[in-house]
Amino acid sequence: MKSHKSVRLISGIVILSVVFTLASTAGPVMAADKEEAQGIVDKAKVTLEEFLRDKNYSWVNEHINKEKGVLIYPQVLKAGFILGGSGGTGVFLARNAKGEWSQPAFYTMGSVSFGLQIGGEAAEVIVLCMNQKAVDALMTSKVKFGGDTSIALGPVGAGAKSNVVADFVSFAKSKGLYAGLNLDGSVVDVREGLNQAYYGKSLTPIQIVVEKKATNPGSSALRAALKKAK
């Protein structure tokens, strides 16, 4: 009987130790994730402003406040190994009928190979959502560009004019220069952990973007920058 009691006692101590360990590490991990999330939002603002200032991307400036939403990736890395895998994390914001921009939801983007035309290893990327179909696709599941939704490279150059017909239109630059980044075949998926860290609770993109179940004042500068576009 004593041996059984000893086993139960030891088991209880082990379980309590695990619980206390998890409790002690959960806070720092969540704080780190929140810091990472805010960093992505801040960098997204910088990326957006760089595109808006660049005359070669005047089409972005002229259309961003006319379209349904935008994906902003401050850095998409080309790994250069294992089939040239590439990817990055960014934010998605949608614009409602009143012209108001939503809170950001976090999304990853990955591809076997993006094939940067200028041979760079990293790029800043903006993808405009041209219709409701594009927004709905991001709200419901992971999206494969060129699958159920179409994507096209956006017009580049001072005074560029073009009637692009696609669900998504992408723009990319690397080291301040045009990067003909082909996103066809790449996959965009929700970064659930960062969404939870940024808003303090588990939320779906619909709850963040459409239902406005949470806010974070850290996104105000990014949203203001979007509003300033022509």
Which residues are covered by each model-predicted region?
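Small-residue-enriched, tightly packed secondary-structure blocks
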Residues: 31-230
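Bacterial N-terminal signal peptides
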Residues: 12-24
